[in-house]
C-alpha cells in the first residue's frame, strides 16, 4: 500500500483500532501499532498557552524515544510493578475530527481530537486533547512513527499514563 492508496477511512480505522486496543488492554497488539523507531511524546504546558518544544530540554508528561520505552511500560503494567496502575483503570476513548494534514509516498501526517473517560477508585476522570501522528506507510499497512499528545486539561488528580491518551 502506498500513502496515495491509503484512504482517509484507513487512517480513521487505524486510529480507532489503537484506541480500542488500549481500552481492551490488548497490549501486544497495541505495541504492534508502533514502529520500532516510534517516538511517543506528551509535552507539558510551559505556561497557560505555550507547550514546551523539546523533550530533551524540558519536562514532559510522557516521553519515550522509541518503542522499547513503550514495551518496558507494558511489561510493568503486566507484572503489576506499576503501583500507579494498580488496580488498572477502566478507560473509554472517544475519537473525533480526524484530519489528514499531509501525505507523501511513505508517510501520512494526521491529527485528531480525543476524550478519554477513566474510572478508578470509584472516581470518574476525564482527559481530553489533540494528538498529532506521523504514520509510516508500508506494504504491511500503517504504523506510528511519531505520536505527540497535547493534553488540554493538565490538572491531573491521580496519574496519567499511555492508556489515558
UniProtKB/Swiss-Prot annotation:
The lineage of its organism: Bacteria, Pseudomonadati, Pseudomonadota, Betaproteobacteria, Burkholderiales. Transmembrane segments: none annotated. SUPFAM superfamilies: NTF2-like. It comes from the Bacteria. Component of 2-halobenzoate dioxygenase multicomponent enzyme system which catalyzes the incorporation of both atoms of molecular oxygen into 2-halobenzoate to form catechol. Pathway: Xenobiotic degradation; benzoate degradation via CoA ligation. PANTHER family: BLR3401 PROTEIN. Its EC number is 1.14.12.13. CDD domains: ring_hydroxylating_dioxygenases_beta. It catalyses: a 2-halobenzoate + NADH + O2 + H(+) = a halide anion + catechol + CO2 + NAD(+). GO terms for biological process: 3-phenylpropionate catabolic process; benzoate catabolic process via CoA ligation. This is 2-halobenzoate 1,2-dioxygenase small subunit. Keywords: Aromatic hydrocarbons catabolism, Dioxygenase, NAD, Oxidoreductase, Plasmid. Heterohexamer of 3 large (CbdA) subunits and 3 small (CbdB) subunits. The heterohexamer is part of 2-halobenzoate dioxygenase two component enzyme system. The other component is a NADH:acceptor reductase (CdbC).
